Amino acid sequence: MIDPLENGLFDIPDYEQIEDETFPPLPPPLSPGRAELEDDLFGNAEGEEEGEVSKLAEVPVAKRRTVKRPRPKLDANRLISEKGLPALRTLFEDVKFKGKGHETENLKLLMLKMENWAHRLYPKMQFEEFIDKVENLGGKKEVQTCLKRIRLDMPITHEDYVAEEAEIQVPEESVPSGDGGFPEDPFIHSTPAPASLTEEQQQRIELNKRLALERRLAKQKQLESTPISIQEDADEPSTSSSGQFLSEENPKTTSNQTPLKHKPAELQESPLHDNESSSHIANGIIDDDDDDDD
């Protein structure tokens, strides 16, 4: 058998007698003192420059600006906004409730619409909590004023004021002319509704126009009827005074005319009475002035 050591097949150097070279442990990554350790270990000039730079005062880094978005609160101002109580006026316009025997379904539909309205107004609150909060806000002065304006059909939102301006600009041609009517102004004309308005808003504007026209006609009739009553009241004292004046004059005239109309029975039987009745002169008496003229 061939000895491998003799032929040098496995001529491997003997490292058992050689000591291992010791190396210092590596510093942790991205440690603040890494540059100083490198200077001490390797003594490079570049390391010295980096060490000097690291010793300089650190430049303050600009802090990232955070935009704070305040969380909306459910208060009186939010409750009387366009999405709040004024939105309830048109909330059930497209809802059709069923007849008798479907009260449960109608109630569910009503509560569903109210819950939808509450979620749009304040999404971060449950419906039960929302109801309690609205009940507490109901005593606020702003909320009470808003409810009164809704009951009196007064303008609240911007759309209501636009509709009110459209009512004022109703054409005068549609109103019948009269003595007690309003003065006609040729410069007042109706402006067409803007194209951005929805069909529902246009219907509301038309309805407000009709209501304004009806109120205007009623006021015109009232103005036409009031001058007549005032004139009648003013004429009553004059007629009474004139009647009293005539009644005071009548006794004098009647007293003067009684001798002519009612003659004594002795004169009626005399022949002179017959000549007076057949004469063409009134009362059968000839004035002396007429005789002189003849």
Swiss-Prot record:
Entry GO MF terms: DNA binding
Residue numbers spanned by region Disordered: 20-54, 168-203, 218-294
Annotated Gene Ontology cellular component terms: chromatin; cytoplasm; nucleus; replication fork protection complex
Source taxon at top rank: Eukaryota
Pfam families in the cross-refs: Swi3
Compositional bias ranges of the Polar residues kind: 237-259
Biased composition (Acidic residues): 37-51
Entry annotated with the keyword Metal-binding: no
Disulfide bridges in this chain: none
Region annotated Interaction with TIMELESS, chain positions: 74-150
Annotated Basic and acidic residues bias: 263-277
The organism of origin for this protein: Danio rerio (Zebrafish)
Family membership: Belongs to the CSM3 family.
Keyword Transcription belongs to the record: no
GO BP annotations, alphabetical order: cell cycle phase transition; cell division; DNA replication checkpoint signaling; mitotic intra-S DNA damage checkpoint signaling; positive regulation of cell population proliferation; replication fork arrest; replication fork processing
Protein name as annotated: TIMELESS-interacting protein
Record keywords, A-Z: Cell cycle, Cell division, Cytoplasm, DNA damage, Mitosis, Nucleus
Cellular localization per UniProt: Cytoplasm; Nucleus
Main location: cytoplasm
Subunit structure: Interacts with TIMELESS, which impairs TIMELESS self-association.
Function description: Plays an important role in the control of DNA replication and the maintenance of replication fork stability. Important for cell survival after DNA damage or replication stress. May be required for the replication checkpoint induced by hydroxyurea or ultraviolet light.
